[in-house]
Amino acid sequence: VRIVSYNLRKHAASGELTGIAEAYDVDVLCLQECDSEALPERLHHLVLADSTRANRLGLAVYVRDDRYEILHSQVFAVQKSLHDRVLAPANERLLAVHLRDRDNGEDILVGSFHAAPLTALNSLRRKQIASAHDGMRSLSPDTPAVMVGDFNYPWFIRGLERHLTTSGYALKRTTEPTYLRYKFFSGYFDFVTSTGFEIQSVDVLPAGASDHRAIRLDAELAA
């Protein structure tokens, strides 16, 4: 499954989505910081599977529906940061979809995730990530799962990797930094966690109107 994830910077990069879907032959497109009410039902060959409604910074997932049947989708709230309490509503931080491959009948889970901002502690983000993984498992236990998005976790990534390994998830970072807002500050904010998949690399797409660069990956079911 080919997945692209993109933080739109408060919907600023929304005009790029149709071009991305077509140019990169995307199967699943995961969005963060989108305006759910302004999203089209289709982007080229992709259909809108679901989006958040109550969140100030929306999440959405588009799916190639001629290849994948959309079985179910669900929005999950995770632990709130101080930022979430002050600038509510912002606690819907995972949108997960349960898909079935129309060709081989295999089920997969894909999640679009947006962690608390850098004003929160890494320990809170680790709890949010663990809670998001639990939410995905609740949709379909033992189903291969991949979660992509803006993790807001540019430092001390080895500690996060150790935590994920104990829970059965692997972390894959991008080949280049994904956050480019300031010339003197960039980082690997957007990456991938997965279980039951093999992911060789996570590539970064050219910069657009967002302060994040979109990421692209091909996830193969583990043997």
Regions found by a protein language model. Name each.
Residues D103, I108-L118:
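Active-site-proximal loop/helix segment associated with metal-binding centers of metalloenzymes
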Residues I3-L8, L17-R42, Y62, V97, ...:
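Active-site beta-strand/loop signature of hydrolases that rely on acidic residues for catalysis
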Residues K10-L17, L124-R126:
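Structural motif
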Residues H114-A132, W155-L164:
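Active-site-proximal segments of metal-dependent phosphoesterases and phosphodiesterases across multiple
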Residues S73, R137-P144, F151-A223:
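Metal-dependent phosphoester-hydrolase catalytic domains
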Residues H11-G15, R56, N91, S186:
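Structural motif corresponding to alpha-helix initiation and N-cap regions
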